[in-house]
Regions:
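Sec-dependent N-terminal signal peptides
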Residues: 5-15
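C-terminal segment of classical bacterial N-terminal signal peptides
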Residues: 17-26
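Kelch-like beta-propeller repeat domains
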Residues: 3-7, 27-229
Length: 229
């Protein structure tokens, strides 16, 4: 797995297949003119993969990586210089294309869904820096992959939007859910993005979740921008 970092006024941000959730303020505030990519050469790295889930864990100051292609269920953390494989007693089942975001209200990283060994998943897990805990909310979003998920600082909840489920009709989803640390709640906004599988990031500067683009049901791609919050 290739690892790079963006160097911005003394702060670094990790880059891999996807990063979602809260990003350190120093990275958010940096300008493109001062940022550079620097390839890292850690002594140990996770095995090569794609479609891993990754988010910044502000409680521990590390980036957390889980799973990916190849039926992987390993957990790794990156502290800015070193990859460390974690060995929790319990872990989520192997999966790829899961959603992950840091929940600042609870100080945990939230993982949802993805594609498992043979089917789509709709389970919810939280990581507290040392332990994975499966959550068992009474209601959950349906199983999916390619979901957009990010933390909304205004409401103190993790926001989930859309994704792809090959076994439902329609396959592309356009629903909005929020996670408050114990409960998933389906939202019914008057206006919302059209169904898609997308990426989303939290914008702490404005207190909104920003969503851009994604794949459309007709095989094309979107180039629109939406905000939530």
């Amino acid at each position: 797995m290739k690892v790079c970092r963006i160097v911005t006024a003394g702060a670094t941000a990790l880059a891999a297949s996807a990063i979602v959730g809260t990003v350190p303020p120093a990275v958010q505030a940096s300008s493109a003119s001062t940022a550079t990519w620097t390839k890292q050469h850690p002594a140990t790295s996770p095995p090569a993969r794609e479609d891993a889930a990754m988010a910044y864990d502000a409680a521990t100051g590390t980036a957390v990586l889980f799973g990916g292609s190849g039926d992987l269920d390993d957990t790794w953390t990156w502290n800015g210089a070193t990859w460390t494989q974690q060995h929790p007693a319990t872990s989520p089942p192997a999966r790829q294309a899961a959603a992950m975001a840091y929940d600042a209200a609870t100080g945990t990283v939230v993982l949802f869904g993805g594609f498992g060994s043979s089917s789509l998943l709709g389970d919810t897990w939280t990581w507290n820096g040392t332990t994975w805990t499966q959550q068992h909310p009474a209601t959950s979003p349906r199983a999916r992959q390619g979901t957009a998920m990010a933390y909304d600082a205004v409401t103190g909840a993790v926001v989930l939007f859309g994704g792809f489920n090959s076994r439902t009709s329609p396959n592309y989803l356009g629903d909005t859910w929020t996670w408050d640390g114990t409960t998933w709640t389906k939202q019914q906004p008057a206006a919302h993005p059209s169904a898609r599988d997308v990426a989303a990031v939290a914008d702490a500067a404005t207190g909104t979740v920003v969503l851009f683009g994604g794949g459309s049901p007709d095989g094309g791609v979107f180039g629109d921008t939406w905000t939530w919050g």
